[in-house]
Amino acid sequence: MASSKLREPVDEVFDLDLAVPETARLDSSLHKARAQLLAKGRRHRPSRSRLRDSASSAEDGEGSDGPGGKVTDGCGSPLHRLRSPLHSGPGSPAGGSFCLDPPGLRRSLDEDEPPPSPLTRYRPLHNAASHEGLAAASCSPPRSAPSSDSSPSFVRRHPRAEPHSEDDSRDASPPEPASPTIGLDKKTRRKFLDLGVTLRRASTGKSRKEKGSNRLSMGSRESVEGSGRSGGSPFLPFSWFTDSGKGSASSGSTTSPTCSPKHEGFSPKKSASQESTLSDDSTPPSSSPKIPSGPWQEAKCSYPYHTLSQSSDEFLDEPLPPVHHWTSQQVGQWLQSLNLEQYAAEFAARQVDGPQLLQLDGSKLKSLGLSNSHDRALVKRKLKEMAAAAEKERKAQEKAARQREKLRRREQEAKKS
């Protein structure tokens, strides 16, 4: 009982609400403000509207000072809630001494905080706005002149920081990456894209060159391919992936094009001209993995040591015969290029040449041994393409002949005049 009686006056004397006023919470509020400023540094860049709102809230906090030192709470920052009865009076020394604390506190906060990211350049603006309201709230009107927050120099410095942040916020780009490897990856990706474009251009130019030099023999094409493989970049694509659909010669498949299945996608003009270049004495027997049956086996083995220069010069001198001038041997080579070498013997026995080949229909193909409907459809499609290409070539030759005739007439008229 005695102890309880003693505790009652002790509790009355040392009541926390009376002995420790609200000013004891100033430290926790400052820590909260510092934590909020650190959290603001990790957020997105402030927009113009947010900057205007912060500036207007700071001006409202300055203009709301009454003669009695009462301040209306303009914004929700914890620094604006730092009022206490200690500095409510205009003449109290505690109020005057507390008036000089916020600038030093702001400087210490700015000096202690290392900038974690480029976004922290907006932090002084929020600091200035918050501490400006704090200075206006804590200082009395006579004592507010020495404060650096309410001085004209700070007011002049504050609008300078605001246009800078507005200029920076004018950027519509996303926040800068913290790691330089992201930008490096974008640059390298762009370089690789440009490299792919140049490689595609190089491959198309290479296919054009191969189309122009389709009269070269397989030996010369093999030498060109070997030199390109030795000095080329490892990023170069294989030519049979890019050129097979365009109908150009496959430099990767240097084996005999008459036996390669990759040549099924050739254009008719290309296939017609390519078979015409493959003469009997050009291809060595080692270059063909499949040994065809028929009269071509002896012809291919007749000159196994034919040099590259002789074969290339020889084919450069000879003109390319069109499909109408194909022989039965060239028809057999064309069948081998379509992987239909099993029918080559029947075609050779019946002496089917180029003009007869273009006149073949379904019944004639059946009589030649093409019992498979898929093989007949393939041959019909290729024959149709070759006929269209031959017609196109004939029209182009006629047009060129007409143009030459016109030029000759103009020259004659110019000489007469």
Swiss-Prot record:
Location of the SAM domain: 326-389
Annotated spans, Disordered: 37-299, 388-417
Gene3D superfamilies: Transcription Factor, Ets-1 (1.10.150.50)
SMART domains hit by this protein: SAM (SM00454)
Domain of life: Eukaryota
Record's compositionally biased regions (Low complexity): 135-153, 244-260, 276-295
GO biological process, one term: neuron projection development
Record's GO cellular component terms: actin cytoskeleton; cytoplasm; dendrite; postsynaptic density
Compositional bias per record (Basic and acidic residues), positions renumbered to this chain: 160-173, 390-417
GO terms of molecular function: actin filament binding
Coiled coil: 377-417
SUPFAM superfamilies associated with the record: SAM/Pointed domain
Keywords: Coiled coil, Phosphoprotein
Basic residues: compositionally biased ranges: 40-49
Residues the record lists as Phosphoserine modifications: 84, 108, 173, 179, 279
CDD domains from the UniProt entry: SAM_Neurabin-like
Phosphothreonine PTM sites in chain numbering: 283
Protein name: Sterile alpha motif domain-containing protein 14
